[in-house]
Amino acid sequence: MSSKRQTKGCNVVVIGTQWGDEGKGKVVDWLTDHAQAVVRFQGGHNAGHTLIIGDKKTILRLIPSGIMHKTVICYIGNGVVLSPEALFKEIGELEAAGLDVQSRLKISEATTLILPYHVAIDHAREKKRGEAKIGTTGRGIGPAYEDKVARRALRVQDLFYPEKFSEQLRENLEYHNFMLTNYYGAEPVNYEKTLSEAMSYAERLKPMVMDVSSALYAAEQSGQNLLFEGAQGTLLDIDHGTYPYVTSSNCVAGNAAAGSGVGPDSLQYILGITKAYCTRVGAGPFPSELYDHDNPAKQDLIGIRLAEVGKEFGSVTGRPRRTGWLDAAALKRSIQINSLSGLCITKLDVLDGLETIRLCVGYTLDGKKLDMLPRGAESVARCEPIYEDFPGWKGTTFGIREWDKLPVEAQKFLRRIEEVAGKPIAMVSTGPERDETILLQHPFQD
């Protein structure tokens, strides 16, 4: 028997290399023209992907960005935590805009559910932390992942076994309500109301629920191209980020396999999305930081300009993002963790008009020079950035679609990023529209 495999499609993983908000949604939307399926493999509705097509702005929080393409199948993998309420709200918004969603959306039966008590715990916990709060979105993501690890989570497939679901829900609420009332001093969550709401979603979800792992395997074996869409960013990863100022899931490339039910051999090209500057939402160390709306000591005028020109406000929470220079030393950490094949630099146009542009290429920590972001929030917080300065450009990069038409200074800045990172730039995004993109290396045709 021949050991030669059947011809497979080409699969691409899109990963954020910073603290999220890198512009993954636009890039995924662009790449979807070459894919037959898009897969979400982690996170929940705590991160928004903003797409601008023509004069229409769409924010997707849970449903894969590929839903905007009429022939593409969208999968929500087992690594996602799913709020049925948030899902159907998003489906309603998309269907009101004329999109066929439910026939093209497939949900893993093993996906963990976010229920009202997860949201209640999230809010109560942040309130109790006070000034030491992590800065979660308050949508129950972390508590849902906690239940999953503790093996008490209710999953999508449990909705179709009402007796088992009701028993497990009662046990879960006994535990969580005890914590809410006795430790956090908050109101308990009502069992009957929670059960009724959950059961109301069961029949609506059923047509969309399937064995996603098997479906993806079959799609790949038939030669289809799969696109895996990450949420958040590498530096927010629960294991590899600036812990404890991280999200509650693994948002690195390796989890594209575990979070969707495919093997690692299925991940052929890893595209790292990198903003031309850095942003961060919420608490946590940020070595190249210039501006923080809530910190009087971080009010640098260039940082404020980056926030204003880049419209740096959370697409889900509306919170102002902290801004700073591009950190290539942190990017090197992300490249190491994700085995990136290439980079996509986004929002280059936000740097237009700056007299000088800085690139963080390393740090000084306790008298020693480092060329890569260290592990652990305590060490990162003590890092002093080492910068290289570049002359800005007078012309605009906005909407440019060809490399040779970029200002020479912009080209030199981008080439230096490649040199420091040790990886090629595959794409450059010069605006929010799908076609405002410079293609240097096609991920699906590499």
UniProtKB/Swiss-Prot annotation:
Q: Where does substrate bind?
A: S315, V316, T317, G318, R319, P320, R321
Entries under Gene3D superfamilies matching the protein: Adenylosuccinate Synthetase, subunit A, domain 1 (3.40.440.10), Adenylosuccinate Synthetase, subunit A, domain 2 (1.10.300.10), Adenylosuccinate Synthetase, subunit A, domain 3 (3.90.170.10)
What are its cofactors? Mg(2+)
Which pathway is this protein engaged in?
Purine metabolism; AMP biosynthesis via de novo pathway; AMP from IMP: step 1/2
Active site at: D21, H49
Tell me the residue numbers annotated for binding Mg(2+). D21, G48
Per the UniProt record, one Pfam family is Adenylsucc_synt
User: In which compartments does the protein localize?
Assistant: Cytoplasm
One cellular component term (GO) for this entry is: cytoplasm
- In the record, which residues are listed under signal peptide? none
What are the binding positions for GTP in this chain? Answer: 20-26, 48-50, 321, 347-349, 429-431
GO BP, one annotated term = 'de novo' AMP biosynthetic process
How the cofactor is bound: the record states: Binds 1 Mg(2+) ion per subunit.
Catalytic function, reaction form: IMP + L-aspartate + GTP = N(6)-(1,2-dicarboxyethyl)-AMP + GDP + phosphate + 2 H(+)
In the Enzyme Commission scheme, what number(s) does this protein have? Answer: 6.3.4.4
Which keywords label this protein?
Answer: Cytoplasm, GTP-binding, Ligase, Magnesium, Metal-binding, Nucleotide-binding, Purine biosynthesis
Q: What is its main location?
A: cytoplasm
| Residues that coordinate or bind IMP | D21, E22, G23, K24, N46, A47, G48, H49, T137, R151, Q232, T247, R319
What is the uppermost EC class here? ligase
Family note = Belongs to the adenylosuccinate synthetase family.
Self-association or partners: how does it assemble? Homodimer.
PANTHER family from the UniProt entry: ADENYLOSUCCINATE SYNTHETASE
What's this protein's function?
Plays an important role in the de novo pathway of purine nucleotide biosynthesis. Catalyzes the first committed step in the biosynthesis of AMP from IMP.
Name of this protein: Adenylosuccinate synthetase
